[in-house]
Design a protein with these regions (language model features):
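Glycine-rich segments within core transmembrane alpha-helices of 12-TM secondary carriers
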Residues: 142-161
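Hydrophobic core of transmembrane alpha-helices in multi-pass small-molecule transporters
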Residues: 110-124
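C-terminal ends and interior cores of transmembrane alpha-helices
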Residues: 94-106
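Pair of pore-lining "gating" transmembrane helices in MFS-fold secondary transporters
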Residues: 14-35
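Helix-loop-helix hairpin linking two adjacent transmembrane segments in secondary transporters
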Residues: 157-186
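Central cavity-lining transmembrane alpha-helices of secondary-active solute carriers
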Residues: 60-75
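Conserved small/polar residues in nucleotide/adenosyl-binding loops
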Residues: 187-194
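Intracellular juxtamembrane helix-capping segments at the cytosolic ends
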Residues: 124-135
């Protein structure tokens, strides 16, 4: 590997910052995917709702929550103060996890609305995580690493979901809550370390 671009202290400092901050952004958004995407590993064979495939309805419902959150986020994120970002992230992941537990315990069709709240809780996370890295001299590199998380994490969340169902015999309804719970523990343990 050629590191000739690191010619002086400032370049080296930028390189280290890109690895540290970009890696933190990548891992943070990857944990968001652990709360958002594992249900896509489930097939929900034989289930339908309102004459449509159950998984399609669940996916559309979650996307609608996510879409609404994007519109709310336009105002919310622009006004969110730096000292409140971590609280916002923690609140959003707890709400998203509670929605996944609701998805597991509520009977159909009520449980699909839990996925709406899951999407609603997570829809602003990209913007909040990006707010930590924007305005830097190397924002473009940091944003690239954040973007990579979408490519990697979607498949990883689905693979983890399949593993949990196949090897631990967790149901299709409880699997997202189990994986999301693990992500919550990672988020909150890191937040506790920062105090």
């Amino acid at each position: 590997m050629n590191f000739s671009f690191i010619r002086d202290r400032r370049s080296f400092s930028d390189f280290i910052f890109i690895l540290w901050a970009g890696g933190a952004a990548l891992l943070s958004y990857s944990l968001v995917y652990a709360l958002r995407k594992p249900f896509t590993a489930a097939t929900f064979d034989g289930l339908s709702i309102w004459g449509m495939d159950y998984k399609v309805v669940v996916t559309i419902t979650q996307i609608l929550g996510y879409l609404l959150a994007k519109f709310i986020g336009i105002k919310l994120i622009s006004e969110l103060k730096g000292q409140h970002r971590l609280k916002f992230i923690l609140g959003a992941i707890v709400l998203a996890e509670l929605a996944l537990v609701g998805f597991a315990i509520l009977p159909s069709p009520g449980n699909i609305f839990a996925m709406f709240f899951n999407g609603l809780a997570l829809g602003c996370m990209w913007g909040v995580i990006f707010s930590f890295i924007e305005g830097r001299r190397v924002t473009d590199m940091l944003a690239s690493l954040l973007g990579i998380s979408m490519v990697i994490s979607s498949g990883a969340a689905k693979s983890l979901g399949l593993f949990v169902m196949d090897h631990w015999q967790v149901s299709e309804f409880w699997m997202p809550a189990l994986i999301g719970g693990c992500a919550c523990l990672l988020y909150t343990s890191d937040a506790a370390d920062d105090r």
